[in-house]
Amino acid sequence: MYLALVALTLLAACVIVQSAGILLLIHWLPRVREVLESPHVYRRVGLLLRVFVWIVLLHLIQVVLWAFVFFRAGELPNLETAVYFSLVTYTTIGFGDVVLGPGWRVLAGIEGLTGIVLIGWSTAFVFAIVNRMYEHWRQVHDPA
């Protein structure tokens, strides 16, 4: 029961981080119109680069949340190992060279599921931005 509560708390924290980060990006995105209307391609590339960096930072924050819990619970020997384990688990790479103890293994699976869903959310968000750029380009270059 305790581990289920830990998992639920971490999942909720990750959703809060992801939501807050995406909402901040959405708040910032009205400036996209001026980027889209700019004749300079480098501004569009710069916009995408900023979005990608921001999204990677959001996911790294989530990875560190999981890692901190694993480290504080004494499941992993140091924070560096915990971050490494959490990163390969969250991204579902799962090398298997670092593992949790029997009681905590299920949390690794939940972290992986959380990562899949939230990375998917980020992918959908980036797709929406790129689609918006494409639609704008199409209207300008192929108005028919």
Where are these regions (language model features)?
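Membrane-water interface of transmembrane alpha-helices
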Residues: 17-33
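Membrane interface segments of multi-pass transport proteins and intramembrane proteases
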Residues: 30-42, 139
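Transmembrane helix-loop junction
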Residues: 27, 31, 71-72, 128
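Outer-pore turret/helix-boundary of cation channels
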Residues: 57-85
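Pore domain of cation channels
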Residues: 8-14, 18, 81-90, 95-139
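Interfacial helix-start motif at the membrane-water boundary
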Residues: 43-60
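Helix-boundary and loop/linker segments of multi-pass membrane transporters
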Residues: 1, 39-45, 97-101
